[in-house]
């Protein structure tokens, strides 16, 4: 907590927060949590983490690891609930088999009007 109180930059728990039950023990120690679907396992658990974090007056970041467009499209569904978003994992893939919502050159995440997550398999 000493480091947090002296830092002008928000301190965000990443690997320490895998499920909603982790959030209460982090409250007061960090400013927020970084939610990654790869860590928590589902949109449902991610939403639980958001709700518990907000109940503890914490910030929420939606992040990713090295992820395909399919995984990022799912994570984008949580974007309206987040303070910060870092969903650029597909930009690092040479052979992402999916196409759909993507990171624009100006840094915006662009959703499309397709049904569901708006993701399709790239033609071969």
Each language-model region and where it sits:
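Catalytic alpha/beta core domains of metabolic enzymes, predominantly
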Residues: 6-12, 16-88
């Amino acid at each position: 907590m000493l480091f947090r109180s002296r830092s002008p930059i928000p301190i965000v728990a990443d690997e320490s927060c895998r499920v909603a039950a982790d959030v209460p023990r982090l409250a007061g120690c960090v400013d927020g949590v970084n939610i990654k679907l790869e860590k928590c396992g589902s949109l449902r658990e991610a939403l639980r983490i958001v709700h518990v974090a907000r109940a503890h007056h914490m910030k929420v970041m939606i992040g990713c690891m090295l992820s395909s467009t399919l995984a990022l499209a799912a994570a984008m569904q949580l974007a309206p609930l987040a303070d910060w978003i870092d969903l650029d994992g597909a930009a690092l893939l040479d052979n992402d088999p999916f196409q759909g919502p993507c990171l624009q050159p100006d840094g915006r995440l662009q959703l499309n009007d397709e049904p569901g997550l708006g993701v399709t398999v790239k033609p071969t």
